[in-house]
Amino acid sequence: MPYLSVAKFGGTSVANHDAMTACAKIVIADPNTRVVVLSASAGVTNLLVALANGVKATEREKLIGNDLHITSGVAKRIFDTVQSYNVRMISYGASTNNVCMLVQSEHSDEIVRSLHKSLFE
């Protein structure tokens, strides 16, 4: 019976492009990986702690909430655009302007063009 693999990456393992590429290779190498969990990139947790220590408790939610929004409808347009492809992972990065997807390399150019058309044309 095949097993279900859950891959979890965070910290320095998602700190930069090379590290993320290594994570992607791990996921692709195991066909039983069905769930990929990403936590904060290297240093993000420390930045959040510093933010929390430097701001009054009543201000924290407002300050953090200001950066954790996405323009109405953009997420739906992204999901609608990629629904016909085999997307193995979608992750928002440390910025709400950063969306990462793990897809088969032969479809990557087509997906990028489709997303560009959907979001910018």
From Swiss-Prot:
Superkingdom field: Bacteria
SUPFAM superfamilies reported for this sequence: Carbamate kinase-like
InterPro entries according to UniProt: AceGlu_kinase-like_sf, ACT_Aspartokinase, AsparK_Bifunc_asparK/hSer_DH, Aspartate_kinase_CS, LysC_ACT_2
UniProt-recorded name of the protein: Putative inactive aspartokinase 3 HI_1632
Gene Ontology terms describing biological process: amino acid biosynthetic process
UniProt family annotation: Belongs to the aspartokinase family.
Database matches in PANTHER family: ASPARTATE KINASE, ASPARTOKINASE
GO MF annotations, alphabetized: aspartate kinase activity
A Pfam family of this chain: ACT_9
